[in-house]
A protein has these predicted regions:
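Glycine-centered recognition micro-motifs in short, flexible terminal segments and loops
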Residues: 1-21
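N-terminal helix-rich module
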Residues: 1-7, 26, 30-50, 54, ...
């Protein structure tokens, strides 16, 4: 009796199974990247702002210049005081930040810049509120420390 050739070739090889598993893993990874992060937009913006506040304070101290933060229609930007006027720049690598359409930055200050960092490191207190319509997060800059509080914090 001769063995049936068709039965020897039935099923899938290990290589074929591994390729299918790799494709499934890639698709699952791509789908996971498309899901929302779960962190409210106001919280993400507050985290970014708190880091930028600390970097701006450090840039003012190391450069010996006053560094200003100006609230723009889209977010916020930094500038440097040249002794007479505020000049738009990227002091210490601080770039303008666009918060997106869903987040508003509120600060109780008038004029431009809304807040500035003293090169001596002695800075006043400031409170920034970020609101995305559902969550409201406050970033407080007090004595060189940054504190985040509010919904989603």
């Amino acid at each position: 009796m001769t063995p049936n050739r068709a039965s020897n070739q039935a099923g899938y090889s290990l290589v074929e199974v591994m390729v299918v598993l790799a494709v499934i893993a890639l698709l699952a990874g791509a789908a996971a990247l498309m899901l929302p992060s779960g962190t409210p937009a106001a919280q993400r913006a507050a985290d970014r702002l708190s880091l930028d506040l600390m970097r701006a304070e450090r840039a003012a101290i190391t450069s010996g210049d006053f560094i200003g933060l100006t609230v723009t229609g889209e977010g916020y930007a930094f500038s440097r005081f040249d002794g007479e006027t505020w000049q738009a720049s990227e002091p210490g690598g601080l770039r303008a930040v666009r918060l997106g359409d869903e987040v508003r930055l509120l600060i109780e200050a008038e004029g431009a810049p809304a807040y500035w960092f003293d090169p001596t490191g002695v800075n006043g207190e400031a409170r920034f509120v970020l609101d995305d319509g559902e969550h409201r997060v406050t970033v407080a800059f007090v004595n060189g420390d940054v504190r985040i509080s509010g919904e989603g914090a």
